[in-house]
């Protein structure tokens, strides 16, 4: 199956109507009754101006999905760290939507401060699809600027970042702004229907959940000697934990989020696990991230979530979600069914969840009923980060320890000649976390 965050190439207009209110409510917390008078755009039928921050494959796909979702929207500003990525995305979007792209070169911004210029360019809606490290910073700036936000997953790579996102989500609710998360399975009809039945008791009390995200190799690039260390790591962002969070955070969060949803977004008490780097050993190509993770999350009610993710070439792949309860079993991916006393199987169309999430966002803006996915997107991100923490350190850690972690993966400064937080040794090799040696901070 394609990765949930792989670039979208099908840019045909969606024929689906906007989500009904029940779908929107399940997709996030409705901040009903809040006035949009202080927000970026009044409800109605006016053109909504989109700004994009992060123009790689996911960013390009998200722009297309947004424009398919609302035919009265227009792309007016773009930012990316790299000029070639920005111009490539602009060319693709112009080809797909020739009459709805109003981005001149004066509204193409590059470098680490490009996001500020997008926010100052009169946009109503901002798409955040930059490397995950930057999302807390950019989300904070967007909300403070009064913009509605589509925020890709994950939303942070460390505890301070998660806490920042929670604060931004609270501010967005006070200001009547929408935040829609890129955790797209919450907007998939089959997933939503199945998990709603689980929440209604179709499998009884949940005893065990298993989330599996075992795929082939993703990411990795060879060093270009013309690049500074910061440029190389930014080009190869997926393979550096300070930028991506590691693959269990950047990818496996989609699976973990479904179990979080089934647990009503209540965090676990603690977690323990194991992980390592057996195949992804070529340096500097694969940076400092692991290639496999296994984590057990323990909840206060006795439920356990067993989480597995692996990126090895030439191996059996499996991306599935299974919940076992006192009355039956729920299979989300791939079959959307309940087995046991209350048998059921989803028969409808799943819908294009990549477009559906944007439909929900634009409908919320036009109706004056903002959506705020901020709490669950932050908690699901923290769930994944907790898994990385226990595997890197080899320790059992509580949720409270993790959410209050002081480990800040930010560099001292953002500049092309600055040192990233992870630097190679004299042989060009990066330090990799070692369980039992790496300390929890």
Place the predicted regions along the sequence by residue.
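N-terminal secretory signal peptides and thylakoid transit peptides that target proteins
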Residues: 5-26
């Amino acid at each position: 199956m394609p990765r949930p965050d792989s670039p979208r190439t099908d840019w045909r207009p969606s024929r689906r109507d906007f989500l009904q209110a029940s779908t929107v409510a399940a997709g996030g917390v409705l901040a009903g009754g809040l006035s949009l008078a202080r927000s970026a755009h009044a409800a109605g039928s006016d053109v909504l101006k989109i700004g994009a921050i992060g123009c790689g494959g996911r960013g390009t796909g998200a722009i297309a999905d947004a424009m398919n979702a609302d035919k009265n929207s227009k792309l007016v500003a773009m930012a990316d760290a790299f000029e070639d990525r920005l111009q490539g995305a602009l060319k693709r979007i112009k080809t797909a939507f020739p009459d709805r792209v109003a981005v001149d070169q004066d509204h193409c911004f590059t470098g680490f401060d490009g996001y500020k210029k997008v926010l100052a360019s009169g946009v109503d809606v901002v798409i955040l699809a930059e490397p995950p490290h930057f999302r807390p910073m950019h989300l904070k700036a967007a909300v403070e600027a009064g913009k509605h936000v589509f925020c890709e997953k994950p939303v942070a790579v460390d505890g301070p970042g998660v806490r920042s996102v929670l604060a931004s989500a609270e501010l967005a609710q006070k200001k009547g702004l929408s935040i829609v998360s890129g955790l797209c399975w919450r907007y998939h009809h089959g997933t939503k229907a199945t998990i709603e039945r689980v929440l209604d008791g179709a499998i009884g009390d949940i005893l065990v959940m298993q989330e599996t995200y075992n795929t082939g190799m993703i990411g990795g690039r060879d060093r270009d000697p013309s690049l500074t260390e910061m440029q190389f790591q930014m080009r190869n962002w997926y393979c550096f934990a300070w930028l991506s969070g590691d693959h269990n955070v950047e990818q496996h969060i989609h699976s973990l989020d479904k179990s979080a949803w089934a647990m009503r977004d209540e965090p676990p008490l603690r977690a323990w696990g194991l992980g390592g780097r057996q195949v992804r050993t070529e340096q500097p190509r694969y940076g400092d991230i692991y290639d496999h993770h296994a984590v057990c999350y323990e909840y206060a009610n006795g439920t356990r979530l067993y989480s597995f993710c692996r990126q090895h070439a030439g191996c059996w792949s499996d991306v599935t979600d299974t919940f076992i309860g006192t009355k039956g079993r729920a299979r989300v991916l791939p079959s959307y069914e309940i087995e046991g006393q209350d048998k059921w199987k989803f028969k409808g169309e799943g819908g294009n969840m990549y477009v559906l999430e944007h439909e929900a966002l634009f409908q919320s803006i036009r109706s004056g009923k903002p959506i705020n996915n901020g709490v669950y997107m932050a908690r699901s991100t923290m769930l994944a980060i907790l898994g990385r923490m226990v595997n890197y350190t080899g320790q059992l850690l509580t949720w409270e320890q993790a959410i209050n972690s002081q480990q800040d993966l930010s560099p001292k400064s953002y500049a092309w000649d600055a040192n990233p937080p992870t630097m190679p040794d004299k042989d060009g090799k990066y330090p990799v976390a070692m369980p039992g040696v790496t300390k929890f901070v």
